[in-house]
A protein has these predicted regions:
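Alpha-helical linker/edge segments of TPR/alpha-solenoid repeat scaffolds
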Residues: 104-113, 141-147, 174-183, 247-255, ...
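Conserved structural position within tetratricopeptide repeats
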Residues: 83-86, 116-120, 151-154, 190-194, ...
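Long, contiguous interaction/recruitment modules in multidomain scaffold/adaptor proteins
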Residues: 2-60, 126, 138, 142, ...
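TPR alpha-solenoid repeat register
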Residues: 94, 128, 161-162, 168, ...
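Alpha-helical segment of the N-proximal tetratricopeptide repeat
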Residues: 54-90, 97-100, 104, 171-178
Length: 389
């Protein structure tokens, strides 16, 4: 075989080898790619299994913590929420519940650290703002407490948004009453009352708070709304009676208090208040539609009662009275002979003059000798009722 033939054979063999390699290379690449895909999928699957297991463990610890938190087992709850956070360090719900458990243990500084971090992440979260408000209130940081309470009122709530907002406002009102901020409490109560709906129990609670805020007009209105659907509610009847009493509407108060005592005979406060109201109604000579003779007898009795009050007043009161040019005692003694039924019939203006003196005696005596009782109390209330007339 000559040299050219050998070269030809070698070239053919080389070409055949190259063709074999070229045909096998895609197969090799495809195989390697398939292996890579399988490995990637496998690693991804293992990763998902790993994360799913961690999530499951975290949720399991969290569920235990939630149950212990409900049962006020705060120490166990803290441990369980911390265990849950090991599996999901930034979980919002885990951190929030841990903060609540820490609050239960009075560890407010630790709770605050979690809560302020959560607030920075979600400043519109209602529960976070509420817990921050409570902590600020405990620290007597009034401005901060009010800010967080108002944030919570207008914040987002996951469930029953309107109910939660109403509950926060109620808590804010009780806080304001606790710090003697009556005017602010009244404003919040008026805002709350506008959105109560037909829930009579809520109307009654708001009425009670209006009483505490000394807003008797709104209190009476809320008690009336309560009684529309529950007219035998003894607590609402007593509250309405008290509100009407404070407003000086004694005949109205009498009706409510009579009903309150009938509904609850053990209500001694309403019974005592009713006695005072009855005395006011019976002792007021200025009330309408009473016969002249009866009016005159009431004036005579009131004048005698005021005289007895003067006599029984304390020595300190008497000494102060003697310092004035003309004491109430002297005025009473000088007027006494005129206070007869005959004189009162002949001189109608005498009734007003005598009652002005009676009222002056009762006011001064209450200042010098302490709060009055019985008919003296009734006369003092009547004096306030007709003050300026």
């Amino acid at each position: 075989m000559d040299e050219s033939s050998e070269d030809t054979i070698a070239a053919a063999e080389k070409e055949a080898g190259l063709r074999f390699y070229l045909t096998r290379e895609p197969m090799i690449l495809a195989l390697l790619s398939a292996i890579a895909v399988v490995l990637f999928v496998g690693v991804g699957g293992l990763s998902r299994v790993y994360h799913a297991q961690r999530e499951s463990l975290g949720n399991r610890w969290f569920a235990r913590g939630v149950e212990d938190l409900k049962q006020q087992r705060y120490e166990q709850a803290v441990g369980e929420f911390r265990a849950a956070l090991r599996y999901s360090r930034d979980n919002y719900a885990y951190q929030l519940n841990l903060a609540q458990a820490l609050i239960g243990l009075k560890r407010t500084s630790e709770a605050y650290a979690y809560l302020i971090n959560l607030w920075e992440r979600e400043p519109e979260n209602g529960l976070v703002n509420l817990e921050l408000a409570r902590i600020a209130a405990q620290k007597k940081e009034t401005e901060q407490a009010l800010r967080y309470y108002h944030n919570a009122i207008y914040a987002a709530w996951s469930d029953n948004q309107e109910v939660e907002r109403g509950n926060v406002r109620l808590e804010l009102i009780e806080y304001l009453l606790g710090i003697k901020s009556q005017a602010q409490a009244q404003s919040e109560l008026i805002a709350l009352a506008a959105s109560l709906g037909d829930d009579s129990s809520l109307h009654q609670r708001v009425a009670d708070l209006f009483l505490q805020a000394q807003d008797y007009e709104h209190a009476l209105a809320e008690y009336r709304l309560t009684l529309k659907s529950d007219h035998r509610n003894s607590a609402a009847l007593a509250g309405a009676g008290l509100a009407a009493f404070e407003l000086g509407r004694y005949p109205l108060a009498q009706g409510y208090l009579e009903a309150a005592v009938a509904a609850n005979p053990k209500d001694s406060q309403s019974r005592d208040r009713l006695k005072t109201v009855e005395l006011v109604v019976q002792t007021d000579p200025f009330r309408r539609q009473i016969p002249v003779d009866q009016r005159n007898r009431i004036v005579i009795q009131a004048f005698e009662t005021a005289g007895e009050r003067l006599k029984s007043c304390s020595a300190a009161g008497d000494s102060r009275e003697r310092a004035s040019p003309q004491t109430l005692t002297e005025m009473w003694t000088k007027m006494k002979p005129q206070i007869t039924e005959r004189s009162l019939r002949k001189n109608p203006d005498l009734m007003e003059a005598s009652m002005d003196l009676v009222f002056a005696i009762e006011r001064k005596s209450s200042t010098l000798c302490g709060p009055p009782t019985g008919t003296d109390m009734a006369l003092l209330l009547i004096s306030k009722l007709h003050e300026g007339n």
